[in-house]
Amino acid sequence: MNHRLAYHHTPGTGPTLVFLPGYASDMTGTKALALEAWAKSAGRAFLRFDYAGCGRSEGAFADQTLAGWRDDVLAMLDQVATGPAVLVGSSMGGWLMLLAAKARPMQVVGLVGIAAAPDFTDWGFTQDEKMYLLRHGRLERTNPYGPAPTLYTRAFWSSGEANRLLFGPVAFDGPVRLLHGDADSDVPWRHSLQLAGLLTSSDVTTMLVKGGDHRLSRRGDLALLVRAVEDVLAAVETAAVPDV
């Protein structure tokens, strides 16, 4: 890694909770800050950070790829979290958490997905959009969450296609909680059901939130997220206690 990443690390007990934002997002979102506040009050270790080219981290956004952001996650695990970690991935962050768990199977002990979007370079683009990306190298879409359009590059799209996961079993044996809103217009909730079916873990729960949109940032949504994190931590720590 030849760029510096901005991050906030809260020391505490237990596995480090690591929040992974979505595409073109950063570590100052509602969910990241709500989890950090909970972690501080509970004395739990917590880490949030910006991918390269996002937020306050170095790099140009247009130069980034999915594999590069995966490597940013791994760098945070190797250099900051260091010990066991529970990854909390929002949208694209849910894809990155799966790739990180694949690369660090002994370190990543639990997963929480929020509208997880693995393989979205496949199902999230029309055939015309894919052809446009291949021909022109970049595609801009209207951004429903801000004034500037959302940029996708051919390099990012190609990197995503090279790192697809949903073609067979997804190897992970720790506890997993998947949250998804039934009113999500960006990532259809059935993708979380598909992921739940492909995960090899026997401890997978999918929670469908009535009226929940893609961001799941309402007060009740955040409370549900905290409960999901608490549930995963409890499962991890129970499994770590030897039978007597």
Give the role of each language-model region.
Residues 36-58:
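Conserved alpha/beta-hydrolase
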Residues 107-209, 213-244:
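The alpha/beta-hydrolase serine catalytic core
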